[in-house]
């Protein structure tokens, strides 16, 4: 837990999922403070306040009295926002949580943006704003100074209007943007490409990992998926859904769930199945979730997973470990977790410790495919 002193307000903030107390990672950054300082002399009135990419709900908590809209592609960020509102005894009904594909309220007074890691996501969000902002809307974006690039500035200017940067403060920097009467060049809603060796056209929304091609780990994984399973298969951390789609093809008697914490990932998966395997839509479920929360114990025959090792800009194996533990809980006895991962992440030892077994299915210089089977022993 970390404390943020805003002068008139003190907040207790935690990262979510909660970390071990020994972690040095806190739930807020200097960019959050810097953004909030800019609002001291702004007359917000009754018009909407929009907040983008508020990773752990810091800005939403600080501005809860203005009934802000918090927009994020991350379900985990939404859970973090609810958690920190509750932690500070703030009414969660004061904050409206929206995903990045949702319609935005018109004519906002203020827009605060935490600049995301993916420039494509930022562009999608700025284009959505272009449709609703007023000429006098105050637009301020913030990030660590090292993450504010010339390309970032150019994107604001292309989509919204004139832009200037602030001085650096505590290694954070702001972008101030004015709304101009411009028409940005047209851009497709999704990035589309043909998957090698197939006739599938893959549609990726802006925040999907490796959005313009298939990453090399997934390419290896495609060649080593289980066959002829009857029952429930989960593509966990599904991204654009290519792994789950291959599982649909190779397991014609199975039901396949596409699960991710990214709204855009799940939307991309559904779009890709609908366009490429429409006859199999009745065998599919699409779910935005925190790993496998709420999935019934011992109800799944196989979990396929390409686990992330970043949470926002931080490197962590917390998400992968949660996925592995959830998979073990949900798997039937004899069911398997099959993953692809970078060699250096040592997933083999983690799976062996958790499941009591782990088999190397395939490998190359960078990636390994591992399988762990749930035994009948108590756990």
UniProtKB/Swiss-Prot annotation:
Keyword vocabulary terms for this entry: Cytoplasm, Methyltransferase, rRNA processing, S-adenosyl-L-methionine, Transferase
Domain of life: Bacteria
Enzyme Commission number(s): 2.1.1.174
Location(s), subcellular: Cytoplasm
GO molecular function: 23S rRNA (guanine(1835)-N(2))-methyltransferase activity; nucleic acid binding
Enzymatic reactions: guanosine(1835) in 23S rRNA + S-adenosyl-L-methionine = N(2)-methylguanosine(1835) in 23S rRNA + S-adenosyl-L-homocysteine + H(+)
Gene Ontology terms: cellular component: cytoplasm
Family annotation (InterPro entries): DNA_methylase_N6_adenine_CS, rRNA_m2G-MeTrfase_RlmG, RsmC/RlmG, SAM-dependent_MTases_sf, Small_mtfrase_dom
Enzyme class: transferase
Function per UniProt: Specifically methylates the guanine in position 1835 (m2G1835) of 23S rRNA.
Family: Belongs to the methyltransferase superfamily. RlmG family.
Protein name from the UniProt record: Ribosomal RNA large subunit methyltransferase G
